[in-house]
Amino acid sequence: IEHTAGASFAPNPIYFDPENIVKLAIEGGCNAVASTFGILGSVARKYAHKIPFVVKLNHNELLSYPNSFDQVLFGTVKEAWNMGAVAVGATIYFGSEQSRRQLVEIAEAFEYAHELGMATILWCYLRNNDFKKGAIDYHSAADLTGQADRLGVTIKADIVKQKLPTNNGGFKAIGFGKVDERMYTELATDHPIDLCRYQVANGYMGRVGLINSGGESHGTSDLRDAVITAVVNKRAGGMGLISGRKAFQKPMNKGVE
């Protein structure tokens, strides 16, 4: 939803058909397939017993103008449970004006999901225009994303999804929050694995699993980029990665690879 159907599927229109998304996940050996109520609901009767379904509860609908950093619920936990999903996912835009409301909504949804025996996955993303300073984008800073992960596990997410960190020192550069210099000198270095390990530490030292984003497709480097993300994540103590546009914005056989 956040990337819009046209922009997402124009490179490979077969994925306008939800069944092909599920087939890609199955043939690619994925542990689960995460998508919308509409996509998974349209094929649930045929596929919910063949691969675990993760239904995304909320989205940025991206058709309001001007667009805002917000997430709206598209359905309920009970709907996801009724279609045979084993887990629900949700996004909170930490740092945005609406993040407090999103926290309350998703905490309540996750509580009910656990009552039904479902797992919960939280997309712990940052969204604030002031998180960019000059040429540096601190939306992927280890200290900021680590704290977002910490908030996510506090509302009992079983898995957190986060961007792979590319820098550090967001709190200091932006000039807010609380810091201890040892966050930057002892708990992390500039090495990508150490930056990711700081994210893992904020997930109760790995008690809550960390998966990193696959990111947008860059063409011929996609496989290499995915391997790097997976290796960094696993060596840092994470649980892997989630692939989307890197997989379905190319022919099925290449996506499976």
Language-model segments: which ranges?
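Alpha/beta enzyme core
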Residues: 3-211, 220-239, 243
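C-terminal helical cap(s) of enzyme catalytic domains, especially alpha/beta-barrels
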Residues: 236-237, 247-257
